[in-house]
Amino acid sequence: MAVAEPLKIGIAAEPYPPFASPDASGNWVGWEVDLINAVCAAGEMECVITPVAWEGIIPSLTGGQIDAIMASMSITAERMQTIDFSDKYYNTPTVIVTAKGSGLTPDAAGMAGKIIGVQVSTVHEAYAQKHFTDAAEIKTYQTTDEGFQDLAAGRIDASQADSIAIDAFLASDAGKACCESIGAVADDKDVLGLGVGVGLRKGEDELKAKFNAAIAKVLADGTYDAISKPYFSASIYGD
C-alpha cells in the first residue's frame, strides 16, 4: 500500500503575530500554528506547515503545491469563485489604529485627506479601496507590521487591520508609545467576509468534511479555548 503524503498546510511566509511568525530558531509559532496542529490531530491528519508568499498562496493551492490554507484567510465571495472553504474557525472585527489623540474616526469622513496603510491582497485592502479610496490615499504593504512601523514613524496617518493584529501592535513598546485604536469600521460582509476558514481546492469534499469535523471537535472538547487562552483575553471565534 502506498503511504499517504502528509497534507501541506500553507501559511503566509510573511510574519503575522500573534497568529504565525518564526521564532529565533526559525520555527513557526503562534495561535494559528497551534490550531493547525490541534485540528490536524483531531482529524487524524498528518500535516506539515508550508510557508508560502501571501500573494501567491491561492495559486499555490490551486496548482497543487499545498493542500490547504490556514493563514487568517477570510471567507469571501470573491475568493469562493476560485477556491472552497471549511467552516470558519475565527471571526474578529476590522479596526483602524492611528496616532494617539488624532481625533480621526473609522469612516470616510474621518479619513478624508489621510494616508491609510493596509496589507496587500487582503480584505483590509479591498475594504479600504471600496470605502475610503475617494477620501483618502491607500498605501499597501507586504506585511501588516510594515504598515505599523510607518504609522509609528509618522509616515502614514492610519493603519487598518484585524483587531487581534492591532491589539498585538498596541501591546508592543512601539505601539504603546505612539498609537491607539479608534474602533472598528462599519461591517461589509461582501468585502470582509464571513470569518476565517481553511482554504481548500474546489471539489475536495471529503477533505472539507474532515476539516469541518476536526474544527467542530476542537471547539467542543475545550482544545480551542485552551489554545486561545495564552494569546487572547476573550474568545475570537465570533458570531
Stretch-by-stretch model annotation:
Residues M45-V48, M73-S74, D87-T133:
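A conserved helix-loop-strand patch within extracytoplasmic ligand-binding domains
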Residues E46, V123-K139, E180-S181, N212-D239:
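Ligand-binding clefts/hinges and TM-proximal coupling segments of bilobed small-molecule sensing domains
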Residues N37-A42, T50-P51, E55-D67, T82-D84, ...:
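Short helices/loops that flank or line small-molecule/ion binding pockets
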Residues F19-A24, I36-M45, H124-Q142, F148, ...:
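Ligand-binding cleft/hinge of the Venus flytrap
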Residues A13-E14, N91-T98, A171-N212, F232-D239:
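Periplasmic-binding protein-like
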Residues G56-P59, M73-Q81, Y127-K130, D157-L192:
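A ligand-binding cleft/hinge motif common to bilobed small-molecule-binding domains
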Residues V33-A42, S102, G110, I115, ...:
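Extended ligand-binding regions for polar small-molecule ligands
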Residues A4-S72, Q81, D221, P230, ...:
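Extracytoplasmic small-molecule ligand-binding "clamshell" domains
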